[in-house]
């Protein structure tokens, strides 16, 4: 069984050395505003907002302090960040999400979904490459052309009456979309916690709570976009409402001349903060821009990098994992299907365990273990340069489990695009990296301001 589920071996044939710290050419702290606003790097106002949010949730029966706490700090922070630190707005979105999760048995869905149904969904939507960007954030790729109208119709037809799991639903969210959210659970409960436990990054004391995405729209015509409009709108709005701030940078590649029309639809599916993180790259901007944020060895060859990765395959194991992960049962990489991390060895290590069902049999197999480095026993030291002057405070997480963690760092009014965005080489000026850096600095400067609250997204 293990040999059938194990992904392809690493693209690099050379023997790998134990993990070493990955750094960008320039400090990620100054270049991206990262890790400002994350656990351990909150301003005084943000720290106060978090305490107030915890108090409100506890008073209204949605949060228990523990230990362990019912929800870790980074989970709460992503709702605060999505609502621009306005506590009551964050509460409303948090409550809506908790109600939605309970009504649709999201935890049960993820743990019991049929492996074939999960794999069918996985092959259609964003996929983890097995690699990370220069900050240690997981890199996903999404090829839109796989989502043609025939494929989506068949997908929705087969799943129109079932989530292929033991989950009971409220009947309001289409089963096909609920199956999609098993993939979001995989992001927040497997991939991000795994990347958090890898110390080969500039800020290992900060939990990984985002994802970097390459969205490839090459070969997609206007008719296909139009046919997918309803499905993608519903999926995007539900994700924005119930998995807020799971995305960081989104690089769109291969945009045709008519993309300004499509962009007019897309930007209305997301909240403004998410929209501000979407960047459309012209052909000559792709390689230099991606290399500024992702090491070439982790960029798929198709986009000018060195990674032998094809959309649809399982993630390619990273040589940096050597000496860190202890594989078991013949595995050399992570299999498809739901995966969760569980503490073992008195909390000194974490084990990856398979979930879901294969036929009538539940999957429960240990894949590997690795040292548990987060949460640390002591609070991370905060460099005053990383937080607005005079406002730095330390934040510790009370989490001992690793579930549903995702957030982002954007808090300023987005100005990345307008209705007339153009993407062809003749119009873009080729200064994508410079524009991205200026964009980040603008957001970092505004991190401690109090912009107006956003209305809660309604699916």
Name each region found by the language model.
Residues 2-459:
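Basic, amphipathic alpha-helical/coil surface patches used to engage anionic, phosphate-bearing ligands
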């Amino acid at each position: 069984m293990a040999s059938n589920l194990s992904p392809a071996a690493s693209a690099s044939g050379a023997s790998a050395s134990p993990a070493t710290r990955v750094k960008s050419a320039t400090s990620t702290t100054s270049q991206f505003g990262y890790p400002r606003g994350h656990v351990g790097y909150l301003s005084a106002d943000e720290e106060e907002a978090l305490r107030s949010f915890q108090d409100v949730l506890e008073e209204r029966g949605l949060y228990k302090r523990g230990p362990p706490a019912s929800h870790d700090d980074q989970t709460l922070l992503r709702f605060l960040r999505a609502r621009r630190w306005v506590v009551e707005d964050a509460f409303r979105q948090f409550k809506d999400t908790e109600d939605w999760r309970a009504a649709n048995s999201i935890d049960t869905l993820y743990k019991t979904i049929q492996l074939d149904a999960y794999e069918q969904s996985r092959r259609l939507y964003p996929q983890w490459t097995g690699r990370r960007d220069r900050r240690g954030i997981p890199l996903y790729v999404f090829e839109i052309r796989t989502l043609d109208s025939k494929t989506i119709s068949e997908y929705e037809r087969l799943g129109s009456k079932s989530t292929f799991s033991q989950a009971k639903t409220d009947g309001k969210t289409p089963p096909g979309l609920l199956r999609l959210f098993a993939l979001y659970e995989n992001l927040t409960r497997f991939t991000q916690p795994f990347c958090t436990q890898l110390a080969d990054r500039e800020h290992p004391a900060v939990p990984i709570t985002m994802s970097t995405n390459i969205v490839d729209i090459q070969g997609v015509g206007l008719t296909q976009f139009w046919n997918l409009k309803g499905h993608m709108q519903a999926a995007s709005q539900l994700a924005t409402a119930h998995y807020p701030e799971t995305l960081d940078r989104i690089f769109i590649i291969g945009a045709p001349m008519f993309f300004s029309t499509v962009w007019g639809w897309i930007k209305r599916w997301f909240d403004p903060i998410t929209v501000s993180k979407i960047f459309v790259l012209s052909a000559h901007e792709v390689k230099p821009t991606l290399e500024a944020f992702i090491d070439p060895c982790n960029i798929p060859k198709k986009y000018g990098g060195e990674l032998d990765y094809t959309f649809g395959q399982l993630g390619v194991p990273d040589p940096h994992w050597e000496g860190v992960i202890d594989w078991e049962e013949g595995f050399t990489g992570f299999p498809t299907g739901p995966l969760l991390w569980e503490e073992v060895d008195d909390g000194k290590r974490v084990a990856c365990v398979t979930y879901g069902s294969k036929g009538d049999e539940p999957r429960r197999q240990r894949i590997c273990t690795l040292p548990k480095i987060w949460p640390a026993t002591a609070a991370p030291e905060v460099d005053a340069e990383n937080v607005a002057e005079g406002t730095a405070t330390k934040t510790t997480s009370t989490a001992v489990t690793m579930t549903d963690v995702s957030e982002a760092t954007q808090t300023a009014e987005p100005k990345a695009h307008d209705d007339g965005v153009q993407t062809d080489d003749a119009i873009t000026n080729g200064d994508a990296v410079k524009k991205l850096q200026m964009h980040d600095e603008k957001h970092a400067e505004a991190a401690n301001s109090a912009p107006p609250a956003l209305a809660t997204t309604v699916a």
